Amino acid sequence: KIRFPEIEEPVVPDAVEPVSTFPWYTPWRAIIVGKELNTVFRTQMVSHLNPPSVIGDDSWILPGRASWSWWYAGGTTRDYKTQIKYVDFNHAMGWEYVLIDAGWQRMDNGGTMEDVVKYAGEKGVGVWLWYHSGAGREMDSIPTHRLMSDPVLRRAEMERISRLGVRGIKVDFFDTDKQRIIQLYPAILKDAAEFYLLVDLHGATLPRGFERTYPNLMTTEAIRGAETLGRQERCDRAAEHNATVPFTRNVVGSMDYTPVTFSDKVRQGIPAIRQTTVAHQLALAVVFESGFQCYADRIEAYEELP
């Protein structure tokens, strides 16, 4: 059944019904069917229902692996020395990117985001930065919350960080399928492509195949991923869930699950105990397809293993 966004989605006050003018082209609706699971698993149907790429020279669009300090210790995104450790770890591992999540604008303890980007560039590691989508934040007093939703501010910010050498952006908290927010996705991707920025859409809707038109879109969350493992009931069902999503969610597009977590995630002081094996976690790095494969655990968790 085709449904409009829920009225209860309060992020933006817009009506749930879309508005347009004629000629009006409605989206494709597709069903993927195959005689075997491999046919479904390997399909690119959703991508192929989109217009061809508008990016001429795409040699700068490179998939890769990333480290990420936020999952285990959120406050570390503001700590310069911690982020430098992650850059060094990436360099040693041969991973291409490091993601600095929310809070990097207030970085201290010896340096700034700009300093991390410069150092990472010398090590051959590309830096990604987190941004709020701006959904529902038009009147927010925090200016950084509007950097992606306001076209003028967005382009200025993208130009600024591109000049610094930032390689990608993770845009988060879209939080609704109302028309204005759906239209924000291609607007962000288009501007990001102009400034040679890769994109991860987090807290976002189910993939729509935008990556064919804008191949700088590397991945989309839209999955109950590792961020939810702070609850024991999620850990208890993780093995079953992880064995299912390659044939459901991952079929329609790259999946930002943030896998390979060996540590027990602590939420409000209470650890949720991992119920999957080390082998299971390692397999997720291969089984889950994502152009930006962000490994979520702390450095020590990876270094402690053989």
Task: Name these PLM-found stretches.
Residues 1-47:
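N-terminal accessory beta-strand-rich subdomains and adjacent acidic, glycine-rich linkers
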Residues 38-43, 48, 54-58, 75-77:
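Conserved mixed alpha/beta catalytic, RNA-binding, or beta-rich assembly cores of soluble enzyme
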Residues 48-69, 91-96:
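Feature activates predominantly on carbohydrate-active enzymes
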Residues 65-82, 139-153:
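Active-site mouth loops of central-metabolism enzymes
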Residues 80-103, 160-167:
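Catalytic domains of carbohydrate-active enzymes, especially glycoside hydrolases
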Residues 101-267, 271-275:
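Aromatic- and carboxylate-enriched substrate-binding clefts and catalytic-loop regions
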Residues 265-306:
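Glycine-rich, aromatic-lined ligand/substrate-binding cores of catalytic
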